[in-house]
Design a protein with these regions (language model features):
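Catalytic donor/gating beta->alpha subdomain of glycosyltransferases that bind UDP-sugars
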Residues: 147-150, 154-178, 200-203, 208-270, ...
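Cell-envelope/extracellular polymer assembly enzymes that use nucleotide-activated donors
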Residues: 41-44, 73
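N-terminal membrane-anchoring/stem segments of glycan-assembly enzymes
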Residues: 1-39, 172-174, 181, 335
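Short, acidic, metal-binding catalytic loop of nucleotide-sugar glycosyltransferases
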Residues: 61-71
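A conserved acidic beta->alpha catalytic loop
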Residues: 78-87, 101, 133
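Acidic donor-binding/catalytic loop of UDP-sugar-dependent glycosyltransferases
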Residues: 84, 131-146
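Membrane-embedded multi-pass helical conduit in multi-pass membrane proteins
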Residues: 35-37, 271-350
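Long helical/loop segments within the catalytic core of UDP-sugar-dependent glycosyltransferases
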Residues: 21-27, 100-119, 142, 146-204, ...
Length: 359
């Protein structure tokens, strides 16, 4: 039988852990908005795409209208799509690389597609970005300018997230709150939605070929880069691009199963704070059960629920739906279920189905 009072007490941790998550997020430097005058290097934008015909019809027009004075090429890598991904890419006049042969043994699909794109690309800088990422007109130029003028080896950005439904918005907010509660000072994650790196750094480090069998190739690549001494900070790029992560609730659950279980591996001791924050956000549901069955006095419920809601409020505001913070326990519950499912699937070796593949 659950210890209802202990659960209610755990819920009081959601507020300080939520504050910690917000502090950690705000500590990420925001990419400067100015574009200084200098000679722009050549740039290759690489988009790995598997069954992305619909997303490409949004992202490619956004890239067609970006401001970039330097030499620019856009490369779509069609990763064995079953839809019209390659035809859509070609209709926009961008370079399209079709992967026709089976993925070599020891490789996962996305790192293979990214690496094949890098081998073909000609730019001095490589930008790996996803097909669900819509870019603002000057965003990429700002990123290049900052990385070049500050002598960085590259940079990665956390972007504005937009959801297709209030359910996915709620769940993604809870997932980010948990992630940043356990965001340690030595965190070496990169965000695969926007990874900008110098060409020579990519190939000297081995790039995605060095993390070829990783389901979370961006996180693994970030750790590799840090271990090898490269300077590739993660920054905030709220006004650089917008990401539409999941089209359906099923896709969201599978995506979080993949991300949740995989991210835990890379967070080290900080994962305890992530797990504790998710547990604290969920605990008002246990408190509710305790009140309904007469195990707790009713004042516990508004106290625990209010703390969880206030904890998620900054994330709900950023996603444009502040009222969803009132449903914080339900969002965190989905995050927990998805993460546990992903972890069990990984332990059993069955994997999580993602874009038609087990990862």
């Amino acid at each position: 039988m659950p210890n209802y009072k202990r659960s209610a007490l755990i819920s009081t941790l959601s507020l300080p852990l939520g504050l910690l998550a917000e502090i950690n997020f705000r500590r990420l430097a925001r990419l400067p908005a100015t574009i200084p005058g200098f000679e722009f290097p050549s740039l290759s934008i690489i988009i790995p795409a598997r069954d992305e015909m619909h997303n490409l019809q949004v992202v490619l027009p956004s890239l067609a209208h970006i401001y970039y004075p330097g030499k620019l090429e856009i490369l779509v890598v069609d990763d064995h799509s079953s839809d019209e991904t390659a035809h859509i890419a070609e209709s926009f006049g961008v370079q399209t690389l079709r992967l026709r042969h089976d993925i070599p043994p020891g490789w996962k699909g996305k790192p293979y597609a990214c690496h094949r794109g890098a081998l073909v690309a000609k730019g001095d800088w490589l930008l790996f970005t996803d097909a669900d990422t819509v870019h603002t007109r000057e965003g990429i130029a700002k990123a290049i300018c900052y990385a070049q003028t500050t002598n960085l080896d590259g940079l990665s950005l956390f972007l504005e997230q937009q959801s297709s439904s209030w359910i996915s918005s709620l769940v993604i907010d809870a997932a980010f709150a948990g992630l940043f509660a356990g965001w340690g000072t030595a965190n070496a994650m990169l965000n695969g939605q926007f990874i900008l790196v110098r060409r020579e750094v990519y190939f000297d480090s081995g790039g995605f070929a060095s993390v070829r069998n990783e389901a979370l190739e961006d996180v693994a690549l970030g750790n590799l880069m840090v271990q090898r001494g490269y300077l590739i900070p993660v920054m905030r790029g709220d006004d650089i691009a917008v990401v539409h992560m999941y089209a359906t609730c099923k896709q969201m659950f599978n995506g979080l199963s993949r991300l949740g279980a995989g991210t835990l591996r890379w967070q080290g001791m900080w994962v305890s704070l992530t797990a504790l924050h998710i547990a604290a956000l969920i605990s008002p549901l246990v408190t509710l059960i305790g009140v309904l069955f007469g195990r707790l006095r009713w004042p516990w419920l508004p106290v625990s629920w209010s703390m969880a809601s206030l904890s998620l409020l900054p994330w709900s505001r950023r996603s444009g739906a502040a009222k969803l913070a009132l449903l914080a326990p339900f969002g965190a519950c989905v995050v927990l279920l998805a993460s546990v499912y992903g972890l069990i699937s990984r332990i059993l070796g069955t994997g999580v189905l993602w874009k038609g593949r087990k990862v």
